[in-house]
Amino acid sequence: AKYRDLTGEEGCASWPQGVYLARDAFKGMGAATALDLVQERVIGGFPVAVKPAHGGSALGVHKVDSVDDLGEAILDALSFDEAVVIEQWVEGVEMAVSVLGTGWDAYALPPVEIVPMKGLYGTEARMEPGAVQYFAPVRPASLSDDEGDAQAIRAEIERAALEVYRAYNARDLARIDLIWDGAQARVFEVNVSPGMAERSLFPAACAAAGLSLSSVLNELVSQYAK
């Protein structure tokens, strides 16, 4: 799906091509047919990402390099949810863009760049101190060798996050997870309940914007206490 598919307008955000597969459908059509369907629908071939349709902390998320490992990855992802999403694997600069506000008053906080020290940004890496480096805001050199171009790309990334946020009618706060692939922002998750722990991405974005997490949350609470 693209932003314009949701709103009828042209946008700069896109989603990787993918397949939604429910557990009942997987059982009903059989593993062999389901695997054939996935290979037919996911444009670009392997590698693909397999993940639960709902969840967090990368539980049940797999990078699958060949059809031989696809069935096992789907079964594992289905152990965390009633459905899975299989989509193109996208390489690039991984970021999280937090958004505050509602409607046209919403605004993006500085993108947080995510750099695993080794392997993927999976469950273990998220929980292990020192396994991931976070840069808030994203380093200009990660986007372009030219500083001016890097600033323009960052602005486009923030605009893409806002487009998605508004297209989904999100309100108050959310975190848009995406990858900059060198040409566009490829969105792979909209998290309307982002983590608030000390090492979480949303507090890092607040700090990069010069905001304290407590002041942001107090402001949100006060809006609904009036």
Question: What does each model-identified segment do?
Answer:
Residues 45-47, 94-96, 175, 187:
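Broad gene-expression machinery/nucleic-acid interaction feature
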Residues 20, 26-28, 96, 184, ...:
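Short Asp/Glu-rich motifs
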Residues 1-92:
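Active-site nucleotide/adenylate-binding loops and adjacent lid/helix of ATP-dependent enzymes
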Residues 62-152, 156-159, 180, 186:
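Phosphate-binding site of ATP-dependent enzymes
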Residues 58, 134-135, 197-202:
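Short small-residue beta-strand/loop micro-motif enriched in glycine and branched aliphatics
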Residues 146-226:
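ATP-dependent carboxylate activation and anion-phosphoryl transfer catalytic cores
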Residues 21-24, 55, 114-117, 129, ...:
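Active-site/binding-pocket entry motifs
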